[in-house]
């Protein structure tokens, strides 16, 4: 499950992780997340994989190693710094995105055949063209 936008939630819409929403799927779940979208550090090539099932984790680790993947130390430092020191910046970003959401939704209302879904998170909009 891709939860890369999990940090980009609006104040009235908290994120619910897939594992909390569907605990019965824990044994077959892989959750992927990263600070890259939130803090614009995609160039660091880092991410986090959450795998509750030890057997599945072992398979994942083996396959990951087979591709010669090793941890990116610089990316790990950037991620840690972003989460430790970036709260104020993230708050400002969310205020900015909230304003953009209002502007976009208002503009789309003028186009009769388009319907914008209520944005609960992220900077992406879902628009119904049908």
Residue ranges and their predicted role:
Residues 1, 64, 94, 101:
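Short amphipathic alpha-helical/adjacent loop interface patches that line ligand
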Residues 1-3, 33, 48, 118, ...:
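Short beta-strand segments
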Residues 24, 51, 55-74:
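Active-site C-terminal subdomain of aminotransferase-like
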